[in-house]
């Protein structure tokens, strides 16, 4: 990974581990919901990398913590960080909605994504500053028809995947450090579907996926597949906001034109 890539990552990208918590022991239709989540995220950010870990490995009885490893880009990384790390949940199917695999019919322009990000950021600030009436709920729903739920109070410190806390407003937050740090790679868990405190109560009941985002803050903490992807990027004259399709296909880890994950893992 050359200097242009490093500079781009520090100025425009957030590398995040998004843990998913379902209220069922065996989460239903994980592939569908991973597609839904990335579709929601892509409305206000550019998804450069997305790789899921499913709760139940295909062909085995081994259970793991379901998550998404993501590289999200934006021209305003500070606003993206505020929106992303205050994102707490996704409302699942409403009554009558068929959980079928779908793809986005159109790809939003960067200008549209920036507008959506600005709208979410401004709405959150208005809620947190008391300019908009907040109802009695553990979450903020910025619009009635929105599936995204946010923190009732702003997050000040973000947890890294190595268990450290980083001030979301600091310059340090946006640096991908090089030093070696220890990381727990044991992802086998018994409580992968256990929601956070307060998740079981409230108006949404079990019809919700809870998010727990953690920041990848050092190169040594990155998953091997993400390292391969970063090292596979080539220096060229084009901006990294438009990553070469062939590189993505060779690595088989980027979203293919924002159409979602491969259909190889449909059972669930």
From Swiss-Prot:
One of its GO terms (cellular component) is mitochondrion. The keyword Metal-binding does not apply. GO terms for biological process: Group I intron splicing; mitochondrial mRNA processing. Its main location: mitochondrion. Keywords: Mitochondrion, mRNA processing, mRNA splicing. It is found in: Mitochondrion. Present with 861 molecules/cell in log phase SD medium. Involved in splicing of intron aI5-beta of the mitochondrial COX1 transcript. To baculovirus occlusion-derived virus envelope protein E27 (ODV-E27). This is Protein MSS18.
């Amino acid at each position: 990974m050359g200097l242009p890539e490093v500079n781009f990552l520090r100025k425009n990208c957030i590398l995040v581990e998004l843990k998913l918590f379902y209220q069922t022991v065996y989460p239903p239709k994980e592939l569908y919901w991973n597609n839904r989540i990335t579709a929601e995220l892509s409305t206000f950010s550019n998804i450069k990398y997305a790789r899921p870990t499913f709760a139940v490995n295909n062909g085995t009885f081994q259970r793991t913590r379901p998550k998404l490893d993501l590289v999200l880009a934006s021209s305003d990384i500070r606003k993206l960080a505020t929106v992303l790390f205050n994102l707490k949940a996704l409302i699942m199917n409403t009554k009558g909605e068929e959980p079928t695999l779908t793809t986005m019919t159109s790809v939003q322009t960067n200008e549209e994504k920036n507008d959506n990000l600005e709208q979410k950021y401004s709405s959150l600030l208005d809620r947190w500053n008391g300019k908009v009436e907040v109802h009695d709920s553990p979450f903020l729903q910025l619009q009635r028809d929105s599936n995204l739920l946010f923190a009732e109070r702003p997050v000040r410190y973000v947890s890294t995947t190595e268990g450290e806390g980083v001030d979301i407003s600091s310059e340090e937050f946006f640096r991908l450090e090089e030093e070696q740090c220890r990381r727990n790679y044991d992802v086998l868990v018994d409580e992968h579907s256990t929601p956070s405190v307060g998740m079981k109560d409230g108006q949404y009941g079990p019809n919700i996926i809870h998010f727990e985002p953690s920041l990848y803050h050092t190169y040594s903490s990155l998953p091997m597949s993400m390292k391969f992807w970063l090292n596979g990027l080539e220096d060229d004259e084009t901006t990294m906001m438009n990553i070469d399709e062939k590189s993505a296909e060779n690595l088989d880890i980027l979203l293919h034109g924002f159409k979602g994950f491969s259909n190889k893992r449909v059972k669930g």
